């Protein structure tokens, strides 16, 4: 997930603090397996307009789950790729070729393709806030995925972020889940889509069905591109989902990325962040073989 100014609590501590274990999803790894089988059967092509900092990682994560990325952002070819794609991923991180974002969303609407939007740094700079809200006003979006500060900005129209990181005051903890979930639902209802808020606890909702995900490790905040990669992974799940399944699709994509982080950390903790980054891709490509479980809960 995109870096947040708070470390994740260890999984055991989180489980001990859980207030409502009755809502924990059973057989969640089998559910994840069914999603991956659907992706690997359909091998959806994703048209990705992502940022130049993390483009390679995003492409590799999409490949690791069984989907296929095309990273074409030139305005004159975006319509053709949206037409043949199963879904569209837009990340406004470096705002290069920003005119292509609107073209992609316009043609995605015309062709009926789901869009996953990552509003990187919204609230930190007026230009990207204006751009993102303008896109959302004009075109439908299947999933918005961002950190707590970015999502709050989309709910309130103003926010405070530390560059592209979430502000400390926006951290998602056991105590702040109700307040943060209210923000997630507000954005989902405002823009008529599923919203995935990344944090120490991830929150996902379409305004009606809501999930909490407790997968992941603090090291994920120290490697650039984990949030962008999760957006790409979410795009793969969204591309094979029905409209009514978008919240579930985003929840399992979120869990899968967190699970991969846990598996990668187990191997790389004595080596360092460079090895962790490599092991993260390894774990994503073999996630069902890893000794990790989705920790998803219906709220």
Please provide the spans of the model-predicted regions.
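Glycine-rich phosphate/adenosyl-contacting loop at the front of the ribokinase-like
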Residues: 18, 22-71
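Acidic-glycine-rich active-site phosphate/pyrophosphate-binding loop
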Residues: 24-37, 193-215
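Charged C-terminal helix
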Residues: 27-30, 259-299
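Active-site cofactor/substrate anionic-group-binding motifs, chiefly glycine-
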Residues: 61, 65-111, 117
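Glycine/small-residue-rich loop that forms an oxyanion/phosphate-binding "nest" at active or ligand-binding sites
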Residues: 104-146
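Conserved phosphate/ATP/ADP-binding segment of small-molecule kinases
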Residues: 128-210
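Short glycine/threonine-rich catalytic loop with a Thr-x-Gly-x-Asp
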Residues: 217-234, 246-247
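Conserved post-catalytic alpha-helical subdomain immediately downstream of the catalytic base
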Residues: 234-278
């Amino acid at each position: 997930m995109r870096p947040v100014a708070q470390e994740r609590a260890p999984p055991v501590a989180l489980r001990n603090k859980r207030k409502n274990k009755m809502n924990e999803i059973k057989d969640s790894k089998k559910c994840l397996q069914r999603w991956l089988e659907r992706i690997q059967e359909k091998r959806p092509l994703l048209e990705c307009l992502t940022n130049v900092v993390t483009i390679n990682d995003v492409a590799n994560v999409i490949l690791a789950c069984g989907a296929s990325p095309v990273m074409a952002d030139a305005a004159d070819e975006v319509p053709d790729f949206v037409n043949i794609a199963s879904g569209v991923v837009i990340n406004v991180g470096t705002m290069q070729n920003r005119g292509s974002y609107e073209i992609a969303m316009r043609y995605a609407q015309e062709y009926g393709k789901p869009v996953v939007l990552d509003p990187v740094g919204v609230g930190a700079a007026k230009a990207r806030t204006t751009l993102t809200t303008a896109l959302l006003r004009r075109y439908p979006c299947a999933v918005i995925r961002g950190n707590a500060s970015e999502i709050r900005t989309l709910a309130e129209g103003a926010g405070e972020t530390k560059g592209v990181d979430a502000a400390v005051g926006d951290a998602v903890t056991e105590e702040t889940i109700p307040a943060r979930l209210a923000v997630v639902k507000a954005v989902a209802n405002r823009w008529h889509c599923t919203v995935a808020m990344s944090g120490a606890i991830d929150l996902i909702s379409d305004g009606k069905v809501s999930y909490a995900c407790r997968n992941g490790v603090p090291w994920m905040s120290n490697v650039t591109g984990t949030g962008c990669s999760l957006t790409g992974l979410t795009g793969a799940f969204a591309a094979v989902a029905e409209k009514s399944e978008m919240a579930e699709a985003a929840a399992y994509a979120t869990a899968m990325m967190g699970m991969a982080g846990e598996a990668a950390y187990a191997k790389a903790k004595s080596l360092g962040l460079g090895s962790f980054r490599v092991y993260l891709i390894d774990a994503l490509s073999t996630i069902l073989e890893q000794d990790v479980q989705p920790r998803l809960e219906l709220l």
